[in-house]
Amino acid sequence: MARTVFCEYLKKEAEGLDFQLYPGELGKRIFDSVSKQAWSEWIKKQTMLVNEKKLNMMNAEHRKLLEQEMVNFLFEGKDVHIEGYVPPSN
């Protein structure tokens, strides 16, 4: 049976992650309170950020920036701003 969590991003009960995907205390917080759906949405934003800002994961400052954006997105309800990106209209 799938594990459920109260997702802080979706603000509802949803299927939880299968295992901890991020190290440390932040990783535990993500595992305990972020759903698969929210994590999937974050991964899309993360990919856009890395590509548009040309982030290098070997650079500690770039990793710190990405981690802060992740916390803002998943836990603080702040959308990721990518300069020049206009989301498609429905």
UniProtKB/Swiss-Prot annotation:
Give the record's GO biological process terms.
cellular response to oxidative stress
Q: Which PANTHER family match?
A: FE(2+)-TRAFFICKING PROTEIN-RELATED
Q: Does the keyword Iron apply?
A: yes
Q: Name one GO molecular function term.
A: iron ion binding
Protein's job? Could be a mediator in iron transactions between iron acquisition and iron-requiring processes, such as synthesis and/or repair of Fe-S clusters in biosynthetic enzymes.
The entry sums up its family as follows: Belongs to the Fe(2+)-trafficking protein family.
* GO CC terms in record: cytosol
Source domain of life: Bacteria
What protein am I looking at?
Probable Fe(2+)-trafficking protein
Q: Which UniProt keywords apply?
A: Iron
One protein family per Pfam: Iron_traffic
Please list the disulfide bridges. Answer: none
Q: Does the keyword Iron apply?
A: yes
